[in-house]
């Protein structure tokens, strides 16, 4: 009688050390994950930047070398939210760099290997004079091969439909290292749960500041779903929601989220501030997984989590967050 072997399982967090803004891709049969490490988040980088994990089975992750050769120090020491995409025979790393939470620029670095080293191209994707704060670059390739860059930037105008704060944008890419223009708005904050901080001092004034950030786009059944994180990344208000469009450039709608994030939110006492997600369809080529970070219970480290993403009649929902529990990785 043949012995049936149990399927391998994940157990969250899948990597125990600090690993925020996680992004996973596959190259040459190997899974890679890149994220914001503790030194990058604290602005205390030494040597190369952005930790990279590797896995052969999507279950067990080991730390390798960091990916990015540090660009000129005048750009700052806080490096956030890396994403890597292969194109042709090279790999393109998108990230932001700045001084604390000020003057962040979107940059691109290139390598011949998924592990790096990645070397910065020497220029920003956006004009820092016109756009003094831009973060969370997410390149997306549509079915026709055209690339677009989703990202987050600040807005100071206030209308009945839009609050001051960080919002989502999309721009058509001229090449892997150039944008055609600054693009257009995807979504502005509209709801109380998206508040980052009341009475926040920014740009010489005090604002009721709201935040949408961490865009990630998945096309599903002909529609474009732009996932994003809203609220404050440092507490339990943070969570994942989405907006939907019939065209990659919009208009995007997010009706039905007035009460809070629908995809992923805090579970008090267990998982705090889950967010900044990416999505990967692995390892069976059919099952979608939401890759995200969440705080440990002591609020000392953001760690990498993976849970299944399901598409329901009401929209995408995460089968989580889970903590310390195991589930089958479908192979």
Label every model-predicted segment:
Residues 1-331:
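Carbohydrate-active catalytic/glycan-binding domains of CAZyme proteins
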